[in-house]
């Protein structure tokens, strides 16, 4: 069958687990657009300053944007509830019919980032997707696609996040919003793509070892979020930093490596 690594032939020894066990932090991205006359101006706040745990495995982080981030409005539409790729678009159409004024207000881009509060809804649950390289439909080369893990699929809707957004919208008179792709295609969006070259015991279970060294190769390390094997359920920046620091602590200083090479050359 087709192997997405074959066209480059650059890494023939890399594990077949490459692209498998991709994590999204089990995430859903929502927003609330506050009314124009609100006293609270989120754009003047620190970008990420607070978060809450609605359950032991569900964490909501609140994000604000500066006054120059209005382009992000194009990612959002009216929030809809749970459903499928068939029912969620229908629910969106119903919401547009029931709330035409809110829909028209949501289309106004100017000032969106000054009044918007984003909700990053993250979970530490064991779910995943996979990256798959496939031949292009037209022309040569490959294209990257994603697919759900058949045993532990990634959620397309998180009820706690929707309830939190609805709560804030009701109390402020704002507009609860979800990502357009989620509302129209039942596909969630993540700000934290992780995994795909995860840590494992061997090449059959992962792409890198516990020191982030790629199985089958010498002096090739993976030191970013793609090595993370699980959903932390929170912003992963510090976890990625810690894993990278651990990997770097196993790399000998350049002087020691030079001495080792000279000794090896002398003994041979």
Model feature map: region roles:
Residues 15-143, 150, 193, 214-215, ...:
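FAD cofactor-binding and catalytic pocket of flavoenzymes
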Residues 117-120, 143-230:
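A glycine-rich dinucleotide-binding beta-alpha-beta segment and adjacent secondary-structure elements
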Residues 12, 111, 151-162, 237, ...:
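Generic detection of long, well-ordered alpha-helical segments
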Residues 1-47, 224, 239, 243, ...:
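Glycine-rich loop(s) and the adjacent beta-strand/alpha-helix scaffold that form part
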Residues 17, 189, 194-196, 210-247, ...:
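A cross-kingdom feature strongest in bacterial/archaeal respiratory oxidoreductases
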Residues 8-9, 44-46, 52-56, 86, ...:
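Short, surface-exposed linear patches
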Residues 48-49, 179-189, 263-268:
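A glycine-rich phosphate-binding loop feature that marks nucleotide/adenosyl-phosphate handling sites
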Residues 25, 29, 128, 168-176, ...:
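Short secondary-structure junctions and interdomain/linker hinges
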């Amino acid at each position: 069958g087709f192997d997405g690594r074959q066209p480059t032939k650059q890494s023939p020894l890399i594990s077949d687990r490459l692209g498998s066990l991709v994590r999204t932090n089990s995430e859903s991205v929502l927003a609330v657009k506050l009314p124009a006359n609100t006293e609270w101006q989120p754009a003047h706040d620190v970008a990420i300053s607070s978060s809450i745990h609605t359950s032991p495995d569900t964490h909501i982080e609140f994000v604000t944007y500066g006054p120059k981030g209005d382009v992000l409005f194009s990612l959002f539409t009216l929030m809809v509830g749970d459903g499928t790729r068939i029912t969620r678009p229908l629910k969106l159409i119903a919401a547009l019919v029931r709330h035409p004024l809110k829909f028209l207000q949501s289309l106004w881009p100017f000032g969106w980032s000054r009044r918007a509060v984003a909700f990053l809804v993250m979970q530490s649950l064991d779910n995943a997707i996979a990256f798959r390289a496939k031949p292009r439909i037209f022309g040569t080369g490959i294209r990257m696609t994603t697919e759900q893990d058949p045993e532990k699929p990634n959620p397309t809707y998180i009820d706690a996040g929707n309830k939190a957004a609805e709560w804030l919208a009701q109390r402020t008179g704002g507009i609860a919003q979800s990502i357009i792709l989620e509302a129209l295609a039942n596909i969630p969006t993540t700000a934290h793509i992780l995994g795909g070259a995860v840590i494992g015991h061997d090449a059959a279970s992962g792409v890198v070892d516990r020191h982030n060294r790629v199985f089958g190769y010498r002096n090739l390390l993976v030191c970013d979020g793609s090595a993370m094997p699980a959903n932390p359920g929170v912003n992963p920046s510090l976890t990625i930093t810690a894993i990278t620091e651990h990997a770097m602590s196993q790399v000998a200083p350049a002087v020691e490596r030079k001495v080792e090479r000279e000794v090896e050359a002398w003994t041979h």
